[in-house]
Amino acid sequence: MPLTDEQFEQYQRDGYVVVEDCLDGATVEAVTERIDAYVRNDRDATQFERMLEPDAEDAALGDADPVRKFEGVGMVREDDVFAELVRDEAIVDVVRQLQGPNLHLLRSAAMLKPPRVGSEKKFHQDAAYYPIHPMDHVTVWVALDQSTTENGCMQVVPGAHTDGLLGHEAVEYDTDIAISEADYTPEDAVALPMEPGDVLFQHCLLPHYTAPNETEDWRRAFIAAYMRSRSRFTDQNPPEWVDSYDVTGDSFRGCV
């Protein structure tokens, strides 16, 4: 179901909108169970990356590895459960409203915060990872668990997407980057507690942050970033890891 006029205006003004109960329980359960299978190594991830919490001991969670994230568009190529999710009409209808009828997937990831050891994600803009024009792609954040301030819910800086792309710097582990040009703190942000099946639609230039997970429960979410099929790389030599996947509508020669 598309956004209401009020929700659409909020997205344009604030750079985000949360749609409650966007996905049904069966969909949430299927995605959660599939992610858990990869966490337990019951399924092999051959077309996407698996990253662990940098400071957690391997045995911190017993039979489950302290996985921080699975990353790569290969997630939807390799696994039908993830492919069905990124094509779910409840999500795609909203993205069409924001981006138009021709859509490619730019990113897919499972963002996890394991109990007690889930680390923070510093303030950043998703657009900083991707040399894409126009710089307006939509990040979709699907809550698979109850997401709270205690376990690391999304926190955003409303309206800051209008400031454009800010300078970023690399952080000390994996592929993370953090905003260096502005000094945001959690006091600048609005926390977005969410229930399983709620979906956050977020402008790629919106600064956001998640705190560590200090609870005894997992905080799991699935991310899908959608761009217009006419999008182009702004760099002649884009990063090798940048990928795309046709979601709906037409594709265009010379575009991403």
Language-model features: where?
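Non-heme Fe(II)-dependent double-stranded beta-helix
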Residues: 1-14, 20-123, 129, 237, ...
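Non-heme Fe(II)/2-oxoglutarate
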Residues: 32-34, 38-41, 45-49, 53, ...
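Short, conserved beta-strand element in jelly-roll/cupin
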Residues: 98, 131-149, 193-194, 201, ...
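Generic beta-strand structural signal
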Residues: 101-108, 119-121, 136-142, 152, ...
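Short acidic/polar capping segments at secondary-structure boundaries
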Residues: 110-117, 128, 135-136, 144-149, ...
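Glycine-rich phosphate/pyrophosphate-binding beta-alpha loops
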Residues: 126-128, 137, 208-213
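Short, P/G- and charge-enriched loop/turn segments at secondary-structure junctions
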Residues: 126-129, 187-189
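Double-stranded beta-helix
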Residues: 147-209, 231-234, 250-251
